[in-house]
Amino acid sequence: MAKSQDGVAIRHYDVVLGPHITEKSTMVSEFNAVVFKVAADATKPAIKEAVEALFGVSVKSVNTVITKGKTKKWKGRPYRRSDVKKAIVTLAEGQSIDVTTGV
């Protein structure tokens, strides 16, 4: 298994694609939860392992949601946006991740 310089497996970066910053995800942060965009084939145990390794926090639970892509039109022709999988990660008491830094 390939590891980066800080000891985190490179495959963790393939699981967690980035934070999902919306008004709703900001409201959920009051309940000690963070929302991430994740790979479509990522499982809950893999997401938990990746978040714990990447951010050095303890994860209490992981809930996932698959948002189906909308049908849009471009130059009169219909196309479909990609599906997005989101993970709502609830952290243990006293743990926090600040995803808004650097935005």
Curated annotation (Swiss-Prot):
Write out the entry's keywords from A to Z. Ribonucleoprotein, Ribosomal protein, RNA-binding, rRNA-binding
Function as written in the Swiss-Prot or TrEMBL entry: One of the early assembly proteins it binds 23S rRNA. One of the proteins that surrounds the polypeptide exit tunnel on the outside of the ribosome. Forms the main docking site for trigger factor binding to the ribosome.
Identify the PROSITE patterns for this entry: RIBOSOMAL_L23
Gene for this chain: rplW
Task: Please name the InterPro entries in this protein's record.
Answer: Nucleotide-bd_a/b_plait_sf (IPR012677), Ribosomal_uL23-like (IPR013025), Ribosomal_uL23/eL15/eS24_sf (IPR012678), Ribosomal_uL23_CS (IPR001014)
Organism of derivation: Zymomonas mobilis subsp. mobilis (strain ATCC 31821 / ZM4 / CP4)
Q: What is this protein called?
A: Large ribosomal subunit protein uL23
Gene Ontology cellular-component terms for this entry are: ribonucleoprotein complex; ribosome
Task: Name the Gene Ontology molecular function terms of this record.
Answer: rRNA binding; structural constituent of ribosome
The family annotation for this protein states:
Belongs to the universal ribosomal protein uL23 family.
Q: Which domain of life is it from?
A: Bacteria
GO BP terms: translation
Q: How does it assemble?
A: Part of the 50S ribosomal subunit. Contacts protein L29, and trigger factor when it is bound to the ribosome.
Q: Which residues, if any, are the signal sequence?
A: none
